[in-house]
Amino acid sequence: AGPLAAAHLLQHLLGQPHLASGYHLSVYPTINPTGLAAGTRGDRDGIDLNREFWRGSAQPEVILLEQELRRERFQGIIALHADDTCEGLYGYAHGRLLNEELLRPALRASGQHLPMDRRPLIDGFAADAGVIHFCFPGVLAAPPDQQPAPFDIILETPAHAPEALQAAAMVDGVLAILSE
């Protein structure tokens, strides 16, 4: 759903550019093109690229993105994922108040399309109204030594939901973040 959401977001912003006023957006439809093509979480070698960042990975996709993240020093990162084990929308705030303050409106906006995952434990982490404060090591993120640290959010949709609803939820979530 992430690539579809990226395309819909860009189409939406082309029609209403004022919604991104003051932002320089870099949109990556996927970080795992071979996994996307195969319909798998892992890449062509079966490796979950979203556990490889900032851990000395030899995977070319990870190396290239790490180089770009260092060069560009983004002020914010929004990762869009579909989770095949969740019961609804949720997100990762990485233990930072700024991230949580951006994630909650994104979840509310996304909730117009899909239900919230309100379980107290999601993906093995404690959750509060769909917000998880900690995350797996190796996920796509800014360089660990980047200062000031950018906001960094992961927005998850239920993979079992129709792709169009996931994409709509993701787009509205990103637009909510941009409006904050």
Question: What function would you assign to each model-found segment?
Answer:
Residues 1-180:
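Structured catalytic-domain cores with a bias toward divalent-metal coordination
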